[in-house]
A protein has these predicted regions:
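Structural signature of hydrophobic alpha-helical transmembrane segments
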Residues: 10-23, 66-78, 119-130
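Cytoplasmic membrane-interface segments at the C-terminal ends of transmembrane helices
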Residues: 29-42, 84-101, 136-150
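Central hydrophobic cores of alpha-helical transmembrane segments
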Residues: 43-52, 101-109, 147-160
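Alpha-helical membrane segments in multi-pass integral membrane proteins
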Residues: 98-142, 151-155
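Membrane-proximal helix-loop-helix units in multi-pass membrane proteins
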Residues: 55-120
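N-terminal topogenic module of multi-pass integral membrane proteins
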Residues: 1-58, 62
């Protein structure tokens, strides 16, 4: 609900930040990181957090969004929430596994920012890229930053490609 209020309060060129699905993943990352002592608990926390973001969005946008897009988000949203929550829980782990997980959500956010910068334009996408970089620094551990940066770079490319596919389908 907070995202919807934010979307309405921000000027048009910034309002996109309240409705970007990648930034919704940050909510799931935080839930998974804070509540997930094990990966499965992080996945459950992330899924729950994403459903909490998704239900108000679906309720508010049901009349103005094509049914195919609503169905897509009802399927993809909870799965993405579980993945982001699991990545949050795993990012707390020591070693390479935790470092690789730390790059997942920042990479997704960065990929969406690249897509927005290249195809949509506007200042919000530049800010989202800065948020992705900042999130990567905060989530990654000093000793494993190179692994985290590597996984984030791969996810940037994959997320940007997924955004392109999404646009071509809907």
């Amino acid at each position: 609900m907070l995202l919807t209020v934010t979307h309405r309060l921000l000027p048009d060129q910034w309002a996109v930040l309240a409705g970007t699905s990648a930034l919704w993943g940050v909510v799931s990352l935080v839930a998974g990181r804070r509540l997930g002592e094990r990966t499965v608990h992080g996945a459950a926390a992330g899924l729950t957090a994403m459903v909490g973001v998704l239900i108000p969005w679906l309720a508010i946008h049901a009349a103005s969004t094509p049914p195919a897009e609503l169905a897509l988000w009802m399927i993809v949203g909870p799965v993405a929430g579980a993945i982001c929550g699991a990545a949050g829980a795993m990012s707390r782990m020591p070693g390479r596994r935790g470092a690789l997980a730390a790059g997942v959500v920042p990479g997704i956010v960065g990929g969406e920012a690249v897509y927005g910068l290249l195809l949509i334009g506007g200042p919000a996408w530049g800010l989202e890229s800065v948020l992705a970089a900042g999130l990567l620094v905060v989530v990654s551990r000093r000793g494993g930053r190179l692994c985290a940066f590597g996984s984030a770079a791969v996810l940037v490319a994959l997320a940007a490609a997924a955004c392109l596919v999404y646009d071509s389908i809907l």
